[in-house]
Amino acid sequence: MLLRLCIIATLLVSHCVAVSTSPATRDTNGEGLLVQTSSGPIQGFFNQTAPDVRQWLGVPFAEPPVGDLRFSSPVKKQPNGTVNAFALPSSCIQQTSNSSTIYTTYETGFLISGGDSEDCLYLSIWAPRIENIQSQQRPLPVLLYIPGGGFTSGGEASLYKIPDKWVQRTQSHIVVIMNYRVNVFGFPNAEGLSEPNVGLLDQRMAVEWVAANIANFGGDPARIALWGQSAGAASVTAYSYGYPEDPIVAALIADSGAPNIVDNEDYAHTNFTFLASLVGCDGLSSTEELSCMRNVSARKLQTALSTYSGSPSISFTPAVDNKTFFANWTERAITGKVAKIPLITGSNTNEGAGFVSFTPAGPSKSTLFEITESIIACPVAEEVKNRNLANLTTYRYQYAGNFTNISPLPWFGAYHSAELPILFGTHYEYGGPSTQYEWDVSYAMQALWLSFVEDPTRGPVRLAVGNVPANPTNESYFAWPAFEQGSDDLLVFAEGGKVMQLVGAGRIDDYC
């Protein structure tokens, strides 16, 4: 399982692309743009790309994790004047790679933009106009998104994952996206530290901040869904085990990931000590080593980590601490040590295409299938099985879309992350126009995700929209059935010309 994360970490790397988020309107007269929070007053804006969406980009939820706070648990942000939240924040320090993948050659819209920095613990918020919220007579549900990146890279500044157009269209939900520390800065696992997984603690602090403050933005703190993809999905599901009695959120969504994709066996803390030796902090006690590493420049650490090519490789991902990350997820599930809240989870039919070095012809179908199953699909299936053992409500899907503006070469198919432009509603923006079928799939998936957070107890439902029925049998109402082992309750999107259809999960599970 360590190989799974090594592959994800190597291929989902950071490269810079341009994102423009310049504010067109900074208004404080009744528009609900200046919001009081525990971090101080936050000034937002409108712009022309989504004129009915209030945006706050780069809202601090923790103090900058620099100096003595490097490698330490996050510290709540203290107010220090008005924050002008007008631009997406820098991502946390990235571990980079020169690998050639479909993301670096064709689909750069998934890559982060705007550079990276240690001062990175920010989140961004997209909400409808205040008068549109007030007309709905209750606060809005909230999707709180954790980006992926193999726990070594990633952040909120990614073209395909900017939700302003989605919020503009629905005017019925709020989206929040967070940054968190990654690689050695987020998962140092140093002998001198009591907390090896401070990146996961960053995520928890972001959840706490949103729960405490989202009402002031028009959101409902009782209707927050924690949503993530890839490493973000692993974080979401791990979160449910780490906070079984106090999850804060009401629902979970995990796209293409589960906690068992991570197997960090560095119990002796050797990775941190080895990295320390590369930057001049060798031969020290654990306390001295930690102090020395806190005084090395962030760029020097980044360069040492990103350029080391020896064997065995070194990586920094969540380590077992039996507080935020556990050695036996099945045992946690069957003993009830998991949050009793519902989950949507699933995988894509051709995840493997995102984890191979790019060639125009691509690997064989059998190779891609084996990678898909081993790295993502089977770990997700195992997590679903664990939740079934714990009698937890789980809705399971598979995404099969192969749209040319997202997958320009036929062998790409529904690769790792390909569902995200469909869900965020950005599928038409960067690779050419979308077909009506693609729009129909997007609307269906968005409707189900949103209905889930609107009422997690009821579960995801969908009404017919225009000429598009709610499901393939032309009914006007579709209720997604909770998944049970051996049932035909796997909801497949975008396959065989159908928007969605229920099938058996043997197409995945029989090969695990």
From Swiss-Prot:
The keyword Hydrolase applies. Glycans are attached at N47, N80, N98, N271, N295, N322, N328, N391, N402, N474. It is found in: Secreted. The keyword Lipoprotein does not apply. The active site is at S230 (acyl-ester intermediate), E351 (charge relay system), H416 (charge relay system). Its main location: secreted. GO terms for cellular component: extracellular region. Disulfide bonds join C92-C120, C281-C292. Optimum temperature is 60 degrees Celsius. GO terms for molecular function: chlorogenate hydrolase activity. Its EC number is 3.1.1.42. It is an enzyme of class 3 (hydrolase). Residues 1-18 form the signal peptide. It catalyses: chlorogenate + H2O = L-quinate + (E)-caffeate + H(+). Optimum pH is 6.0. Pfam families: COesterase. Keywords: Disulfide bond, Glycoprotein, Hydrolase, Secreted, Signal. Extracellular chlorogenic acid esterase that releases caffeic acid from chlorogenic acid (CGA) contained in natural substrates such as apple marc and coffee pulp. Shows no activity towards 5-O-p-coumaroyl quinic acid, another quinic ester derivative, and rosmarinic acid, another caffeic ester derivative. Belongs to the type-B carboxylesterase/lipase family. PANTHER family: ACETYLCHOLINESTERASE (PTHR43918), CARBOXYLIC ESTER HYDROLASE (PTHR43918:SF4). This is Chlorogenic acid esterase. It comes from Aspergillus niger. The gene is chlE.
